[in-house]
């Protein structure tokens, strides 16, 4: 990354406060943005990082179908960021839930974005998207109780996960070697213990983003991409997909590239690769931002 310097990004709008261009970041389901601090470190050498601390836990932006309100939360946060820093546009970076909501924000309000790098968005595409759409419709029938989406999405597992521990130390011991967390770097996992949990009145700790919100996010994953849009966003965007991600195995990025001409590249790791390889992923993001600037 020695070839990348501040001059590499000089054509981007510059914050009147920090004299750097601005990245707006949005996090994965259940992973508050401060957990990503190891990922932010390299980016912060060149950019000011702004983010929504917690998606899915704000009454003004409830978790609803197709993540419409969460998408609006991204748009509103980006508008506020532009106003704060005196810029017309930001660079958007998102992971998972945050990547998908950011993508939808690109379609909704493209004028606020210069470009985007989206990491492993749950962009369910093609015929599978139609299946999810029908499943969500059927789940609204009496007595269905979200039965179909709990099978199709991670909601069925998430709703049964443990969400209370005696202490942060207890949570660390119980979670560190679990499949979902086992490949996190130590700093990323320590960040989750610090920011992904909060203390209850009785001294125990629970999820900072409630389990009910986490489950609701999975059940309402956007499912209209069998129908629309049939064009790429108006601003440059590239996807980064984990080599072991279920989305790559289901060939969603491949379909998106073929249909919408949105490019993707891969990085070692699974769906949570930005927390498994924060330094190399941040370098990849910087390289993509520079590449997309050069292509304009």
Q: Language-model features: where?
A:
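A short loop-to-beta-strand scaffold at the N-terminal edge of the catalytic core in hydrolase folds
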Residues: 2-16
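Conserved HGGG/HGGXW glycine-rich cap/lid loop of the alpha/beta-hydrolase fold
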Residues: 13-61
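Active-site loop/oxyanion-hole signature of alpha/beta-hydrolase fold enzymes
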Residues: 50, 54-93, 132-135
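Short glycine-rich catalytic loops that host catalytic nucleophiles or stabilize transition states
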Residues: 52, 264-270
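Conserved hydrolase catalytic core segment
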Residues: 89-135
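Flexible "cap/lid" loop of the alpha/beta hydrolase fold
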Residues: 116-164, 249
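Conserved serine/cysteine hydrolase catalytic core
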Residues: 186-257
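Catalytic histidine-centered segment of alpha/beta-hydrolase-like enzymes
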Residues: 269-279
């Amino acid at each position: 990354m020695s070839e990348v310097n501040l001059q590499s990004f000089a054509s981007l709008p510059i914050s009147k406060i920090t004299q750097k261009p601005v990245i707006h970041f949005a996090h994965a389901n259940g992973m508050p943005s401060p957990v990503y601090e190891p990922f932010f470190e390299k980016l912060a050498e060149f950019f000011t990082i702004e983010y929504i601390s917690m998606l899915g836990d704000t009454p003004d932006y409830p978790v609803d179908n197709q993540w419409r309100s969460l998408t609006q939360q991204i748009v509103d946060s980006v508008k506020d960021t532009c106003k704060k820093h005196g810029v017309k546009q930001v660079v958007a970076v998102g992971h998972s839930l945050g990547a998908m909501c950011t993508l939808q924000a690109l379609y909704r309000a493209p004028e606020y974005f210069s470009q985007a790098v989206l990491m492993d968005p749950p962009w369910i595409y093609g015929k599978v998207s139609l299946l999810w759409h029908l499943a969500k419709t059927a789940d609204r029938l009496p007595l269905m109780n979200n039965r179909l989406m709990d099978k199709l999405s991670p909601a069925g597992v998430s709703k049964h996960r443990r969400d209370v521990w005696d202490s942060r130390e207890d949570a660390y011991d119980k979670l560190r070697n679990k499949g979902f967390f086992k490949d996190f770097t130590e700093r990323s996992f320590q960040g989750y213990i610090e920011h992904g949990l909060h203390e209850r009145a009785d001294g125990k700790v629970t999820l900072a983003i409630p389990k009910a919100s986490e489950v609701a996010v999975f059940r309402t994953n956007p499912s209209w991409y069998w129908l629309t849009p049939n064009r790429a966003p108006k601003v440059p965007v590239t996807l980064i997909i984990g080599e072991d991600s279920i989305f790559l195995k289901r060939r969603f990025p491949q379909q998106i590239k073929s249909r919408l001409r949105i490019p993707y590249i891969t990085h070692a790791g699974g769906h949570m690769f930005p927390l498994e390889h924060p330094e190399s992923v941040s370098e990849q993001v910087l390289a993509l931002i520079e590449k997309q600037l050069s292509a304009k």
